[in-house]
Amino acid sequence: MDSSNDEVLFVGTAEDEHVEMYLKAIWHIKERNESVKISTIARMLSVKQPSVVQMLKKLNQQQLVEYNKAGVFLTENGEKVGSHMMRNSRLMEVLMVSALKVEINEEMVCGIEHHMNKQFTNALCIMLNHPRKCPHNHTIPKGECCEKN
């Protein structure tokens, strides 16, 4: 069997997706100008508050958030990941509604957004003509491809 023709399958880690979901949730709460509370994150992600605390401690160690008695704040790197995830999500929603003419399926969007690299995201943004708002009328964070326009 010629191994050069074998299909290579990518298996992402659930841990990476959990990290991205937490950062996206925090980014979204911040976008709404609300203070980031453990209870709000738990409600958004349908998890228990102790799980949120455990993940925030992990994100704090990874320097993606600052988590202390003063609250929860995204670091510069955490902000980048959260913004990137929100951009992916909202561009996928625009693709579904505007280009594919299908109803938004949040479960599908969530499954895809974690696997979109910068090249794919920028190509999608260009194809969609750099949309500024998603179908829910939320701002889509700009990417490098938008800065050139």
Regions found by a protein language model. Give the residues of each.
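Short, hydrophobic-biased segments on the C-terminal half of alpha helices
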Residues: L56-K57
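Basic, amphipathic "hinge/linker" alpha-helix immediately C-terminal to the N-terminal HTH DNA-binding motif
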Residues: A70-N88
